[in-house]
Amino acid sequence: MHDKILILDFGSQVTQLIARRVRDARVYSEIHPYDCDPEFIRKFIQEQGGKGIILSGGPNSVTEDGSPRAPQIVFELGVPVLGICYGMQTMATQLGGAVASAESLGKAREFGYSEVRAHGHTNLLKGIQDFSTSEGHGILKVWMSHGDSVTALPPAFKLMASTESCPIAGMADEDRRFYAFQFHPEVTHTIQGTAIIERFVHEICHCKPDWVMGDYIAEAVEHIRKQVGDEEVILGLSGGVDSSVAAALIHRAIGDQLTCVFVDHGLLRLNEGDMVMEMFARNLGVKVIRVDAASTFMGKLTGVADPEAKRKIIGKEFVEIFQSESGKIENAKWLAQGTIYPDVIESAGKGKKGAHTIKSHHNVGGLPEDMHLKLLEPLRELFKDEVRELGVALGLPREMVYRHPFPGPGLGVRILGEVKAEFASLLQRADAIFIEELRNTIDEVSQKSWYDLTSQAFAVFLPVKSVGVMGDGRTYEYVVALRAVQTQDFMTAHWAHLPHELLGKVSNRIINEVRGINRVVYDISGKPPATIEWE
């Protein structure tokens, strides 16, 4: 049995990052709603290998009546507890401290970079710092996002960290092994966040670092076999990383009981349909049915400009096609999807009490209530880096596993506004040029291609025209935007600082080789505030 960390979710959009950081430390973690049954929590800790509990952040205020609280049993089981942001505030409130809102303190909400001074030598922070002051105080560079603040420590707690604007930025009761931070150690902006979480799970909770993808394969295969039995499964194959790894994992578990349905909706990357068939049907021996549905999708999307409406239409059409194909497969009872954690968090999916919806994902947002197929989502609890690690462990080729993510709705969410076949054709060719040049351009320092140095890169079609000059003539043609980001987890991302020579070459090639486009721009927005995809 794996040692485990229980994460109680109070509705933060980055709760999954906590789980990712714990798993980075090779410790298994599970996320459950903050108001789950206390008996479940007791069994998780006492019978299922639970070694510690983390309380997440959230959008509520503990100063308001009826705001969420941690089940009291959390503080009675004798295991370490770590509170983060709202988790710190509810811990303080429930254990006898005090919390006040920014408004009542006459302060503004604190959001962004901050430098925190560590106090004393707690077991959690001892020796962890980014730099020290001339007085010898250890300083941490962290990310804050809060309105309320703890104003009085609970009995038996001591001050662990502070800033000028947040005098109690961390607290600790070392006898009970209760710790809490106002800042977010789970986000990459907190430089020592990984070290803090590793210290908590390894040295405070004494968890064994035994969570590896090889173990996950064995467990997932067993679970899939028990779940599916002798029934048939169909999987929507896109050729992207997630659906590819899901197909390989399910095929490992049930072999020919899996049939992949590859829907060519006319919104794929250039020549992608043929490449997908070559990779799966011929190289991996997986049963694949190719469905040419371009005209159907284009018809459904005619006149639709709203991005949420497009996603819902594309998702619904996918499901209907799968249902139709399942009728041709004897005993088909399951629809498999490559849904992963970021899909769920961006959809404010199951378990996200109080979370705010950002955008829906086609895997979780467009499923009809009367769907005749049961859902099989073997990657639902994994982050992108874990999915890639799993793909390698399954023996998939590197070019498949490390291919950049591609959205389920395809170019439907990379063509702003209404989707037209003309726009799709222009975008396919522009995007292919961008990716080709990224693969062919090697960074002198790392000796890696810029494709490998970026986490996701693509072109976006803008349904606006601009004036240009080609030869002696005036042109009035469309604009494409190039987007390239670098990220560790896809929850936050930085725009990639591509070489100007590379961008210039891509722009020249697109304008000269793709008739209908006369202007190329580069997106330099981070996430947040922007999302990675434009729609």
From Swiss-Prot:
- GO CC, one annotated term: cytosol
- Keyword Nucleotide-binding in annotation: yes
Q: Does the keyword Cytoplasm apply?
A: no
Q: What class of enzyme is it?
A: ligase
Q: Which SUPFAM superfamilies match?
A: Adenine nucleotide alpha hydrolases-like (SSF52402), Class I glutamine amidotransferase-like (SSF52317), GMP synthetase C-terminal dimerisation domain (SSF54810)
| Pathway where it operates | Purine metabolism; GMP biosynthesis; GMP from XMP (L-Gln route): step 1/1
The Glutamine amidotransferase type-1 domain extends over 4-210
Q: What residues sit in the active site?
A: 85 (nucleophile), 184, 186
What does this chain do? Answer: Catalyzes the synthesis of GMP from XMP.
GMPS ATP-PPase domain spans which residues? 211-403
Keywords per UniProt: ATP-binding, Glutamine amidotransferase, GMP biosynthesis, Ligase, Nucleotide-binding, Purine biosynthesis
- The domain of life for this entry's organism is Bacteria
For this protein, the record's InterPro entries field holds:
Class_I_gatase-like (IPR029062), GATASE (IPR017926), GMP_synth_C (IPR001674), GMP_synth_GATase (IPR004739), GMP_synthase (IPR022955), GMPS_ATP_PPase_dom (IPR025777), NAD/GMP_synthase (IPR022310), Rossmann-like_a/b/a_fold (IPR014729)
Q: What is this protein called?
A: GMP synthase [glutamine-hydrolyzing]
Listed under subunit, the entry gives: Homodimer.
Give residues annotated as binding ATP: 238-244
Which organism is the protein's source?
Polynucleobacter asymbioticus (strain DSM 18221 / CIP 109841 / QLW-P1DMWA-1)
Q: Which GO terms describe its molecular function?
A: ATP binding; GMP synthase activity
Q: State the EC number(s).
A: 6.3.5.2
